[in-house]
């Protein structure tokens, strides 16, 4: 992400280049894949014009532009109605609000194609334009019952209907590498759809049952259960839970919390003076426990994460601040499990933790304790 004239945007060409470099590396190490599939974070997208050229910039979900349109969208379609249709958690950065910003600015006027980030990266490998289901559900515009784009939402927000095409399920074929890609990487391969929302892929690999929850622990912590049907009720809306699409049309009933983002940015603010293990040991050396809302808006994209956290809990020594971050995360997980039991009418006995954050033994320990 980079700041471009006050707007947080993705260096999309860099992302494309890194994907292609990663594919080329397969040939270098002698492990040529028969298929390639891409997953990424949700909600962000790329618009293409009729010539399949990018309409830039590709704005990041961490940009604050959507804060100004929440009330406008709610006047057109209430959050209660949106949730009843889509089952998606209210978050200021949801695609629905980003697209509404683009409509107001005129950015959609010349848009012919709408691709979520993994769809776009697959397009750059194959020159085939297709949309995938699981990531599309993070837009807040896919009907949870029909599993199709909700035409009523699209019409009421006056979004161009031609942007929203067929939604393909995971494992569907996209196409083979273009000749240009083949020449660069040194081989051909078939590109297919993964569950292209990264959490959908992570959950697909989780051995969860009816009495288990998963925590996909990465930049975000996503906590939830799998369900054959969307769970849309007063309790789930009040607790702000999402019903995101999963493999085989299973639903990921979950809630998003800030996760390793807090530690990543604190470490960056300290000029990477400490490793993550050293930060963990500092936290363990402290007995200080203060709680804060890990989803506080001030933590989404602060200039300085350490300062932002201390604004919530008071100015504390580093070890104490880190301890409070750990305990606040673990308590948020506990609260989410309590809400799942209430909303989904389940008793939770096991927690499966996947993702990079699963390497944090102290956070795992606190999660078990809470």
Walk through the language-model features, giving the residues of each.
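N-terminal glycine/serine-rich phosphate-binding loop of ATP-dependent small-molecule kinases
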Residues: 1-57, 67, 84, 110, ...
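Short loop/turn motifs at secondary-structure junctions
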Residues: 31-32, 163, 330, 347
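Short beta-strand-loop/turn "lid" adjacent to the catalytic site in phosphate-handling enzymes
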Residues: 4, 28-61, 86-93, 118, ...
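Short, intrinsically disordered, charge-balanced linker/junction segments flanking boundaries
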Residues: 1, 163, 355-356, 367-370
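A conserved helix-loop-beta module that forms one wall/lid of the active-site cleft
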Residues: 151-172
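Short, conserved phosphate/pyrophosphate- and ester-handling motifs at nucleotide-, phospho-/glycolipid
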Residues: 11, 63, 198
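Active-site core segments that coordinate phosphate-bearing ligands/cofactors
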Residues: 67, 74-87, 92-116, 122-130, ...
């Amino acid at each position: 992400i980079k700041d471009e004239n006050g707007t947080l945007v993705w260096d999309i060409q860099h992302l494309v280049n890194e994907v292609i470099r990663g594919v080329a590396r397969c040939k270098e190490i002698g492990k040529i894949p028969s298929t390639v599939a891409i997953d990424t974070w949700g909600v962000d997208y790329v618009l293409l014009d009729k010539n399949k050229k990018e309409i830039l910039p590709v704005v990041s979900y961490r940009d604050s532009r959507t804060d100004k349109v929440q009330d406008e969208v709610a006047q057109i379609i209430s959050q209660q109605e949106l949730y009843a249709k889509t089952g998606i958690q209210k978050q200021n950065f949801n695609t629905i609000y980003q697209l509404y910003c683009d409509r107001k600015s005129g950015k959609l006027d010349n848009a012919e194609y709408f691709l979520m980030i993994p769809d776009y990266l697959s397009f750059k490998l194959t020159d085939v334009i297709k949309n995938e289901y699981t990531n599309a559900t993070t837009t807040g515009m896919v009907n949870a019952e029909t599993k199709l784009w909700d035409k009523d939402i699209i019409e009421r927000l006056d979004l161009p209907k031609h942007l929203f095409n067929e939604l393909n399920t995971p494992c569907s074929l996209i196409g083979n590498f273009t000749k240009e890609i083949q020449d660069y990487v040194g081989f051909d391969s078939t590109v297919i759809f993964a569950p292209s929302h990264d959490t959908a892929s992570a959950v697909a690999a989780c051995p969860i049952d009816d009495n288990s929850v998963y925590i996909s622990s990465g930049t975000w912590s996503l906590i939830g259960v799998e369900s054959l049907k969307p769970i849309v009720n007063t309790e789930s809306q009040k607790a702000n839970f999402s019903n995101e699409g999963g493999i085989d049309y299973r639903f990921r009933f979950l809630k998003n919390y800030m996760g390793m983002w807090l530690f990543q940015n604190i470490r960056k603010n300290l000029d990477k003076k400490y490793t993550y293990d050293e930060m963990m040991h500092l936290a363990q050396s402290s007995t200080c426990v203060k709680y804060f809302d890990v989803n506080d808006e001030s933590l989404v994209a602060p200039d300085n994460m350490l300062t932002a956290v201390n604004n919530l809990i008071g100015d504390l020594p580093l070890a104490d601040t880190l301890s409070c971050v750990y305990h606040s995360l673990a308590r948020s997980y506990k609260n989410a499990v309590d809400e799942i039991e209430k909303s989904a009418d389940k008793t939770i006995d096991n927690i499966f933790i996947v993702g990079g954050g699963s390497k944090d033994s102290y956070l795992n320990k606190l999660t078990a304790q809470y």
